[in-house]
Amino acid sequence: MVLKRVRCYYLIITIRLKMKVFTNKNLSIEQYGFINTFPNQNYILSYLHPYNPYSSLIVCYDVGLGKTYAAACLAHMYLDSGFKVLYLSNSLNSIDNFSNEYEKVVLDSRLNSLKKNITIKSFSKFYNCEKRGESDNVDYGLIILDEVHNLRESAYRYKLIKNKLDTMNNSKILVITATPMIDSKDELDSILSLTKETSRIIFSENKIDIKISYVGQEINGETLFLSEMKGQQLKEYLKVVNEENDTVYSSSRQASISLSNKFNPSIPLDEQSSKINAFINSIKEGELTVLFSFYVKRGIDFTSSVLESIGYKKWNSNKKQKRTYAVIDGRTNKKNVEEILTSFNSIANIKGDNIHILLGSSVLSESITLYRVKHLHIISPFWNYGQIKQSIGRAIRIGSHEGLEDKSMKVYLHAAHYDKEGKDIDIWKIAYDKNKDIIKRLEELKIDNEFSNDSLLDIPKIDNEMVIKINEWVWDFRNCFDTNKFKISWCKIYEDKAIGYNLENNTKIMGNIPSYIRINRPIPGGYTIWRSCIDKKLRISFIDGEVNKFSKRGKLISNVNTSEIAKDLNCENNIESIINTLKEQNRYFDKQIEYDL
């Protein structure tokens, strides 16, 4: 067994982002009340804010890091500001997922009224409408292109959609993909050209602390789960290899999975399918297992019949059964998909009491989350790492292994062979070689976008008075007060001159003081004692309508006539008693700038 961290499986890089300065006071994202957004999501929301000047952003965050939720939050910001939103994706799972995520964002009665201003279409539907001249001509404030790697599948569709985007000059564009390059390092260029400007492209480091171990032995640089074909399967495989003249090896790939569409109990399993025989032998009781197969009949259908031959039953929502399996493929309707996923992901299924084994085709490989999976099998090799990454990403996400003491998963990249040779091994090698070129291109991007934190942010020295550090933020309030060496004024405080530096994503914002930071000032309706952040001295002020007993900057507490104040406050005639009385009334501030997390 080869033990690796998930970040070793494919290149995951963090690009340090060049500093952007946001100056509009309305740019705060706190006002929207988003729950549980992470720094990588907040960067998207801040950068592509409706009132920021930037018109596009390409997000290449890895699977499982909340790209769709961030897109839903961003859509809400535009809808709340009166704009319309267009969401495009070619994955029905992605479309449903985005709609569900938006419902999590809006926690009030405005959901339906806001949601009607979101147009949701597949790339194919959008393409067909444009092709027929049925453009809606809506002036969208935001266009979201999700799973954009699917847009490259059709050159004609890509060109028409790109031409349409080029005419939508007033729209901002958010491009989302976990796999910007699948088959070629040049594919990134087609994504970059979808936007109207030189777009910022951002990657993220995967901080999901789940161990992945690849089971098998290393062949051509990749850890493969080998199984040797024999008997009738090997005869069938060699026959189709000799007859096959196409370059995609469709027949031999299917033959390498199984001999036929259904298990024949009169023939030993290892002579019908070396892969499924190895799969069956790897099954562990009490540990959830997922199997992906590109081919339905020789993959999923054959595996289903094998499972039933050893006592497994197909999951039925109306029956309580033990040792069950479920299937999600192109034949599974939407309602059944939802029921299967709900049952599989339930905490009650942590040991497979509802569904032990889930079989899935390519429809399961995008925009679906699977929880607490311990074993993941890919029995049909892919031509590229993008599809591998998408499949594994279904089960490795933020919170995907909560409830398990051992947060780890085993991955089995199946390869059938004879004498360590075969089309499976060839295809895995092609994918591996492609990935080396893609990694090189990504490394070049990393170098092109590498910046120094110090040179970009120029963060002032923290003094815990006018410059304070709170978590990943440093806040500078030195320009917020109308003061010089001769005057100190509490009445003119310029909150829009506060500067915030985010140390995690290298952003700089102005005028967006979060709600947990307070700049204290005299309270109307009486006396207030406050310590000025300018000279650190205690001052007392009195405000009652238009009445000001002292100057606007207050009066030093050491210089006041205590008898008059003590009489007004009905306390003893000394400074200590006056201070204690105002403390009891919550009208005493020892620090002008306070924060409460």
UniProtKB/Swiss-Prot annotation:
Domain Helicase ATP-binding: 48-198
UniProt keyword list: ATP-binding, Helicase, Hydrolase, Nucleotide-binding, Plasmid
PROSITE patterns, per database record: HELICASE_ATP_BIND_1, HELICASE_CTER
List of residues binding ATP: 61-68
Enzyme class: hydrolase
Motif mapping: DEVH box: 146-149
E.C. number(s) listed in UniProt: 3.6.4.-
SMART domains: DEXDc (SM00487), HELICc (SM00490)
UniProt domain Helicase C-terminal: residue ranges: 275-467
Entry keyword Hydrolase: yes
InterPro entries, per the entry: Helicase/UvrB_N (IPR006935), Helicase_ATP-bd (IPR014001), Helicase_C-like (IPR001650), P-loop_NTPase (IPR027417), SNF2_RAD54_helicase_repair (IPR050496)
Single annotated GO MF: helicase activity
Function of the molecule: The presence of the two linear plasmids, termed pGKL1 and pGKL2, in strains of Kluyveromyces lactis confers the killer phenotype to the host cell, by promoting the secretion of a toxin able to inhibit the growth of sensitive strains.
Stated name of the protein: Uncharacterized killer plasmid pGKL-2 helicase
Organism: Kluyveromyces lactis (strain ATCC 8585 / CBS 2359 / DSM 70799 / NBRC 1267 / NRRL Y-1140 / WM37) (Yeast)
Taxonomic lineage of the native organism: Eukaryota, Fungi, Dikarya, Ascomycota, Saccharomycotina
